[in-house]
């Protein structure tokens, strides 16, 4: 599947140009949000926020929602949250198409493990293992990896391929 190759390439090659531990503001984040909204994801900002998360992607079947909670100011963490939650939407589309469990990463496990071990800061790995059930570790590691290594434009391309059919 072309998407798997693109995800692996995005994760592995982008790390050479982006400092993985650095959240960043991207001009194309708004375009990514529009793409998601235009393709069936109900995106809400600062609604039903309780202070326990920056964002969440939820779905029932193909009824999809992304809730973002940037608060009064939008910063690099909020841009990273959009990329992260968009990756979860890609995982959802791919798993529906493949008929695999919703907590299955898009990348094959060997590629994901190699990328996580070489590119995710240990603090992120520890955060995921501390805050998520073990059966969600792989999808959260993948979302964190791409949040840090892929641009909003690259994630938009992956979303288009996985969820729109482009």
Language-model features, listed with the residues they occupy:
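Bacterial N-terminal signal peptides that target proteins for export
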Residues: 1-8
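Bacterial N-terminal signal peptides
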Residues: 8-17
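Sec/Tat signal peptide C-region and signal peptidase I cleavage site
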Residues: 18-23
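Metalloprotease/metallohydrolase-associated module, dominated by Zn2+-dependent proteases
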Residues: 24-25, 29-44, 102-166
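N-terminal targeting signals for Sec/Tat export/insertion, comprising classic cleavable signal peptides
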Residues: 35-67
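Sequence contexts marking disulfide-bonded cysteines in secreted/extracellular proteins
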Residues: 48-50, 68-70, 92-94, 162-166
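Short pre-active-site segment immediately N-terminal to the catalytic Zn-binding motif
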Residues: 66-82
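Catalytic Zn2+-binding segment of zinc metalloproteases
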Residues: 86-103
């Amino acid at each position: 599947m072309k998407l798997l190759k693109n995800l692996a390439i995005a994760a592995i090659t982008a790390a050479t140009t982006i400092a993985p531990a650095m959240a960043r503001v991207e001009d194309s984040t708004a375009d990514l949000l529009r793409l998601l909204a235009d393709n069936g994801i109900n995106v809400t900002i600062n609604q039903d926020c309780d202070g326990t998360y920056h964002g969440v992607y939820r779905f029932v079947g193909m009824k999809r929602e992304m809730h973002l909670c940037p608060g009064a100011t939008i910063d690099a963490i909020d841009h990273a949250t959009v990329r992260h939650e968009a990756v979860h939407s890609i995982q959802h589309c791919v798993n529906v198409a493949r008929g695999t469990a919703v907590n299955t990463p898009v990348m094959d496990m060997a590629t994901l493990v190699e990328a996580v071990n070489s590119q995710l800061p240990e603090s992120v790995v520890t955060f995921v293992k501390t805050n998520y059930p073990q059966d969600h570790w792989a999808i959260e590691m993948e979302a964190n990896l791409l949040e840090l290594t892929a641009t909003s434009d690259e994630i938009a391309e992956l979303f288009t391929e996985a969820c729109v059919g482009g």
